[in-house]
Swiss-Prot record:
Substrate binds at Y111. PANTHER family: PSEUDOURIDYLATE SYNTHASE, TRNA PSEUDOURIDINE SYNTHASE-LIKE 1. Homodimer. It comes from Borrelia garinii subsp. bavariensis (strain ATCC BAA-2496 / DSM 23469 / PBi). The gene is truA. This is tRNA pseudouridine synthase A. GO terms for molecular function: RNA binding; tRNA pseudouridine(38-40) synthase activity. Coiled coil: none annotated. It catalyses: uridine(38/39/40) in tRNA = pseudouridine(38/39/40) in tRNA. Belongs to the tRNA pseudouridine synthase TruA family. It comes from the Bacteria.
Amino acid sequence: MKKILAEITYDGSIYHGFQIQPTKPTIQGEIEKALMKINKKKVKIHSSGRTDKGVHAKKQIITFDININIQLNNLKKALNAILLKNSIKILKLKYMKNSFHPRFNAQKRKYSYRILNSNNYYPWEGYQAHYVNKKLNISNLNQMAKILIGNHDFTTFSCIKDKSKSKFRHIYLAKFKKRGKYIIFEIIGSSFLWKMVRSIIGTMLDIEIKNESISTFETILKSKNRNLARTTAPANALFLDKVYYE
C-alpha cells in the first residue's frame, strides 16, 4: 500500500463543501468516486482542511493510500479525465511517508478573498467575487488587518457550531491590496475556525462602508462576543491558496 499526496484545485461553486455528505455533492465525494473507478475498491482521502460550501481552492492538499501498479503520471491523467468535467483538477502527485498527514503536518494556511470594487465591470467579472458598491479605502482596511497579526482569541469570529476546544489562532499575515477592479484580502494563519475568515472580512467591510472608526474592529475582536460580529461575507469569493509544510 502506497501513500500518495495530491495537490488539487477546484471550483467549489456547485459543491456543499469539501467534506463528504451522503446526499449532497462534495469535493471529497467526487474524488473518492473517481479513485474507486480506477482502484476498483473504496479509497478514503484525507485533506489539509475542509473548505465550506461554495469555497474554492487554488492548492488544496490531500492524501490517499492505494495498492495498484500504475505510474503517477498515468494516475494523474486518469483522475483528471474523470474530475475535470466536475470542476476539480489534480495538479501534482507524489509519494509520501506513511507517517505524513496533510492536516496534522500543516504549519500554516493561506486564504484570499476577492472583492469587486468597481462600477465598470462585465457580468462575469463578479463570478467568484464579492461586489461592494462603495469605493473602499485600502489604508483603512489595512489598519484593521494589522490588528489581526499575532496570537488572538477569535471567539468573536467563530461559528456557533464550531467545536474547536481553543479559539486561539496565530495570524502571520493579513493585508489588502489593489488588483485592477478587485481588492484582494490575503491572510496566513496557523489554522482557522469555521467561517472565521468570512466573518472577519464581513465585519471589516461593514465598518469601512459605514465609516466607523478603525478602533471599532479591535473592540469587536477583543469582546469575544459572536453577537458583535457583522454579517458573514459570501463564500463564493473565498479561496484556499496554499498550505505550508516544513
